[in-house]
Amino acid sequence: MYHIKHDKRAESSVELICTAVLELLETKPLGEITISDVQRRSTVSRSTFYRNFDSLEDVLALLCDRGFDEIAAGSGAPVYIRVFHYWFNNAAVLEALVRTGRADILAESLKSCCFARRSCRAWTKRGWTTSPRTSAML
């Protein structure tokens, strides 16, 4: 699980880490990338990596979550076209997940994105008559 604080320094470190992972994926399969590789490429300390992520897979989960957030925020083209367009342009993450048998990360990210939007719409239709916690459990 990733756990990122919302301050400029943490967000800057996270961007460096994400960029490093994407760059490393261009030359190595995910299974061969180490935290030390990411640390060297990103110039952030090992402790900074672990302050924000528990594993390399968590970096990919964040990238997936960001992708689905971007897809959901888009407009114009039907959502399925936006999905294919996004992943066509961001194939490194998708390939890394599929090659390592971790498509579950992608599926979980998609489920979280869709669930949140569907839950909010349903809560709105019910006139906010249930608590946020109860609505999330439905």
Region annotations inferred by a language model:
Residues 1-6, 46, 73-92, 102:
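Primarily secretory-pathway and cell-envelope proteins
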Residues 20, 52, 62:
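Residues in the recognition helix of alpha-helical DNA-binding motifs
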Residues 1-28, 32, 37:
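Basic, helix-initiating cap at the start of DNA-binding domains
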Residues 34-35, 63-72:
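Short, basic, alpha-helical segments at the C-terminal edge of helix-turn-helix-like DNA-binding modules
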Residues 43-53:
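Short hydrophobic/aromatic patch on the recognition helix
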Residues 77-85, 101-137:
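Amphipathic alpha-helical packing segments from all-alpha helical-bundle domains
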Residues 32, 55-60:
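Short amphipathic alpha-helical segment with a characteristic S/N-K-E followed by hydrophobic residues
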Residues 33-34, 95-97, 106:
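Short, hydrophobic secondary-structure boundary micro-motifs
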